[in-house]
Amino acid sequence: MRKTKFIIVSILILGFCMIQFGASPLSAFKKLNQVISLSQELYFEEFDINDAMEGAIKGFLEELDPHSQYISKKELESINEQFEGEFEGIGIEYSVLDGYITVISPIPETPSERAGLQPGDKIIKINGESAYKISNDEIFKKLRGRKGSEVKIHILRVGEVEPFEITLIRDKIPIKSVIASFIFDESKIGYVKINRFANNTVQELAQSLFDLESQGMQKLIIDLRNNGGGLLSQAVNMVDMFLSSNDTIVYTKGKIRSANEVYYSSKSIYDKTYEMVIMINNGSASASEIVSGALQDLDRATIVGERSFGKGLVQRQIPLMDGSAARITIAQYFTPSGRLIQRPYDEGIGNYYDESSIEDTITTNKSIHYTKSGKTVYGGGGIWPDFNISYDENFNQFLKNKVRLNTKRPIFKFANDIKIINESKLNKLTEEKYYQEISKGNFLNLNQTKFIEWLDSNNIKYNYEEIKRDWRYIKYDIYAEIGNSMWGKNISYKVRGLYDKQLIKSINILKD
């Protein structure tokens, strides 16, 4: 009976496809139907036909281009959450360290912050049940929940003899797009780090700019590095904030009429006129490339860093009958000067995501275009920065350091121990004073010997030569973790900026 039903459904699908597409794909559909029937008849064990068909749909869409995709119902819920900019829960950033949920930082203005959770706190029980070595899925199920509902957690805190219980009332938790914003006081240069383009991104940016302007900001750096994109509307509205004339921001070209659109600037209520730098790298994609490409083409910002990823395909998300969705590419993005953002993908998906091939395809396919004032810019995929600043080999080696990549997060743990030892000294400092102390030299007497002794005492494997080679970067990461624990993400990003060549270059451009 099961097989008969399936054959009837297959015939109906086949008939529909023939009506829609004509008879030319008939042999392909026959072949698919034959493979399905043979698999059901001959496969050595039972299998879920729905799972198999989902795999077939995924494969079909992946064959079209790297960004058309099938999204399951469960995946779609998570993706929608990211774009909507909120979820319901207790509000912590965490890692599972030594088997326990360890608080990296409480999210500001959430139940966890209001209850006084601290970086380094270990959640050992949830609602009376052990939380030791539970899966991420279980963590989500137990800590997230309806706004107003209650969850009890037992906390083990460094310095406390006994664990203690906290009752939290779940609430709406914002997923921030702007994750850091601060000002370099002496130069009056503002810095804003944006990590996604969601429903509330422009609103968050506007609030950050208002706060920075009230502190005397005169110039601005927007950091879009490793920002993989998001909503087109937010990218367009962000560019519009910094334009005072009617200009094309981005346009799209596709096969169907509705896919051909031009997005223009309007008379913005913001109309920000200060000098700007946009920072990008090869993790900057889609909406990030629309923003950086438009502001570069319209001579509104200087672009610093590395060329961007080159994702310039427009997807339309279409809901399917079971709550899943298909994202189908309907058009390509072009910057105001006519540059196609999408880089070639005819060598296959594996090659498309290979970092070395990204450089090769973009370098090979360079084309010349001109900004509004006549300055030369390059197309062929991705956005080319005005100042190409690559990290040196020393920093690239640090990124691969075994201690830095260790899932036990030794740098975070060591920083937490140093913070506890020096708590009375740190409590007397402001955020700005802390930054000044670090800039002067070896604050808190951090040294390699102490760190290595700590690694040994905690049975953490390391390579001595790597520690010696990378100590400058490790030291600033320790300072950044201490700062994050005391004052939040702003000081963390500011401290890491002390070894960030791309940020240093951006500051120097705006100072000149």
Model regions and ranges:
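Hydrophobic membrane-insertion alpha-helices, especially the h-region
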Residues: K5-Q20
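Cleft-lining beta-strand/loop regions that shape enzyme active-site pockets
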Residues: C17-A28, L32, I36-F44, D48-I49, ...
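Extended, small/polar residue-biased N-terminal targeting/export presequences
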Residues: Y43-I104, E150-A180, R496-I507, D512
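A structural signal for short loop-to-beta-strand junctions that line the ligand-binding cleft
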Residues: I90-G91, S268, R327-T329
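Short linear motifs in exposed loops
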Residues: S105, I134, T167, T329, ...
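Acidic, polar loop-rich interaction surfaces within structured domains
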Residues: N282-A285, G293, R300-V304, F309-G379, ...
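Conserved functional hotspot residues or short segments at active or partner-binding sites
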Residues: L340-I341, Y345-D512
